[in-house]
């Protein structure tokens, strides 16, 4: 990950640290997200977790991880509460398999409000968008199981 990308999102170097960038969200009581460039991971703080677990750290392994990261940043900027954001929500998809929704935003009653499936620009997006138009794709599979969204 490049520092220019982080700076464009208004992340700044963390004081007394090397290769760690931080962003505080004043609209959420200074909630913060940290990015560690040495360890190549994102710490989404103490309120945004993966699939209802207590894990809030994501290792950056693929380009889509950066899309999810930027989307979470924008959700927080827009006023969505960190407590209402769940990453990689698992939904059963039949025959003993499951899928992972990139981002689920819940309402204040903890019901599904917004489902977001992130894709990188180009071939991955085009393929997913074509599938969405054809049969609903991944997103509508999740929606069928949680129609509050």
Each language-model region and where it sits:
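A short, conserved, highly charged catalytic patch centered on acidic carboxylates
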Residues: 1-149
